[in-house]
Regions:
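Active-site donor-binding acidic/aromatic loop of nucleotide-activated sugar
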Residues: 3-10
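Short acidic active-site motifs
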Residues: 14-16, 78
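Active-site donor-sugar recognition loop in glycosyltransferases
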Residues: 15, 30-35, 56
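Short alpha-helical segment that forms part of, or immediately flanks, the ligand-binding pocket
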Residues: 17, 39-44, 58
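Acidic donor-binding loop of glycosyltransferase active sites
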Residues: 21-34, 47
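Short hydrophobic beta-strand element within catalytic cores of glycosyltransferases
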Residues: 48-55
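A charged, aromatic-enriched C-terminal amphipathic alpha-helix characteristic of glycosyltransferases
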Residues: 91-122
Length: 126
């Protein structure tokens, strides 16, 4: 009764996005060190991501104050333990949700990323 699992496969993207709106948590790539596009879209919507979020990925971005991704190993027991802990501590979800949105705004905003590319290449011209 505490958890409803929504498994999705082979959905058109619009339907998939609608399905995500009914969720609080997204279990994403287990073999990743960083969140990929699926996780980032979910985080931008305020979902809590359980997936790749290694400390090195935060360090690379200079992100020292928030850790919104629940990092898991590609191991059934680790995934279970991390999900169980989240269910047992549901009160953490609103804060992690807020941090997820904040993370995407800080580090994955399209205008900031585009400007970083422009700045990089302009610095190489001189």
């Amino acid at each position: 009764d505490e958890v409803q699992v929504v498994a999705v496969e082979n959905l058109p993207f619009d339907e998939y996005k609608r399905a995500m709106l009914s969720c609080d948590v997204l279990l994403d790539q287990l073999y990743s060190y960083t969140p990929a596009m699926n996780a980032l879209q979910a985080m931008a919507q305020g979902l809590v991501v359980v997936g790749g979020g290694e400390p090195e990925s935060y360090d690379l971005l200079g992100c020292a104050d928030i850790r919104p991704i629940i990092n898991v190993l590609p191991d059934e027991n680790d995934v279970y333990e991390k999900l169980r802990d989240l269910v047992d501590h549901k009160a953490r979800i609103p804060q992690l949700s807020h941090e997820s949105r904040l993370y995407t705004e800080r580090y994955h905003d399209h205008l900031k990323v585009a400007q970083a590319y422009v700045d990089f290449w302009q610095s190489r011209k001189n």
